[in-house]
From Swiss-Prot:
UniProt pathway: Metabolic intermediate biosynthesis; chorismate biosynthesis; chorismate from D-erythrose 4-phosphate and phosphoenolpyruvate: step 6/7
Record protein name field: 3-phosphoshikimate 1-carboxyvinyltransferase
Gene Ontology MF terms in the entry: 3-phosphoshikimate 1-carboxyvinyltransferase activity
EC assignment: 2.5.1.19
PROSITE patterns noted in UniProt: EPSP_SYNTHASE_1, EPSP_SYNTHASE_2
Residues bound to 3-phosphoshikimate: K28, S29, R33, S174, Q176, D326, K353
Active site: D326
Amino acid sequence: MSGHGPAQPMTARRSGPLKGRAEIPGDKSISHRALILGAMAVGETQITGLLEGQDVLDTAKAMRAFGAEVIQHGPGAWSVHGVGVGGFAEPAEVIDCGNSGTGVRLVMGAMATSPLTATFTGDASLRKRPMGRVTDPLALFGTRAYGRKGGRLPMTLVGAADPVPVRYTVPMPSAQVKSAVLLAGLNAPGQTVVIEREATRDHSERMLRGFGAELSVETGPEGQIITLTGQPELRPQTVAVPRDPSSAAFPVCAALIVEGSEILVPGVSRNPTRDGLYVTLLEMGADIAFENEREEGGEPVADLRVRASALKGVEVPPERAPSMIDEYPILSVVAAFAEGSTIMRGVKELRVKESDRIDAMARGLEACGVRIEEDEDTLIVHGMGRVPGGATCATHLDHRIAMSFLVLGMAAEAPVTVDDGSPIATSFPAFTDLMTGLGADLAAG
């Protein structure tokens, strides 16, 4: 069963100007999906730029357990020899997805319509997260789920031997739920329809089409209607994974708040369903230039040139939340250094992420001398243009909380310590080396 080693505290101190080129790892969302779709294609899929954080490595291990041949050839270079839609073998062991909500929910979807049984678990954080939001729609296909109280891991799924196509309206904006239903629909006959009231990141739709699935997206009075025709033969692909905009957010935001900084962040995904943070930063007055805009692997990408900026507080509308759900922690840090209040509405989904991210950020920012207001669905940061710092902040085993407070420490008046930096490895193993390479004062302890 997934455990967690001893805590590894880290401290960030006020840093000189950040300068240079920040090479960001591959996009986490696309990396998970490339491995899973590669495993469901017939033949060999080649992947470059794969994120080699623990979350994605756990998904690679899961695909091996279901019978795909997954091989690493070099840094970021992998191949997946797929078994075809409906070709999964029953795993002999428990599937441990570590810290990854995306990994476990997508893999559950991928196996849900095959006549086999699999048991899933994860680390202490993942075992607290609700899985009913995925197992409820999977039950419509005929999948049975047996988990702990509240639909939590460990959980055993018994795949549907005779799946039926499904029409499902996603009750909350969740790309993970949408993607799990679409992946399950691959091995169901007829057409599976997913209706989203609010659009979420569309990597699954782009990549399913790329692998040869018949998929259409229309907008109607109910929202966005995604129709997938089941039982295709997926064709292997060559996937170049763009750089992760959620990981890029950390050096980008650090450069905005550390005086005198100028950095270049090449090859970052500009997918409009993931762009909410950058839209918001520009509204705050951020000096970010998007250079060399191009397309790679069906995704728009650009090089980001970022300079330190005087920022002002803004109101972030709730409809922007799905396109920046992972970026609110780092945005709340930037907001603390802005002049005036930043109001973030429609953020209740943050309460069921790797931690209750609203509570974690509010408590840590308050400890660093920032005035905060919050309710179930709103976070307000009253920026003063400066942050006293000088606190130890709890990360709750959450990689994004850990990185956000370390960025805060780079511009705060007194050092900021996080109680455990080890979760950073789940999404951004090179974070410390990359930031110190740019000039950040960041160290263990």
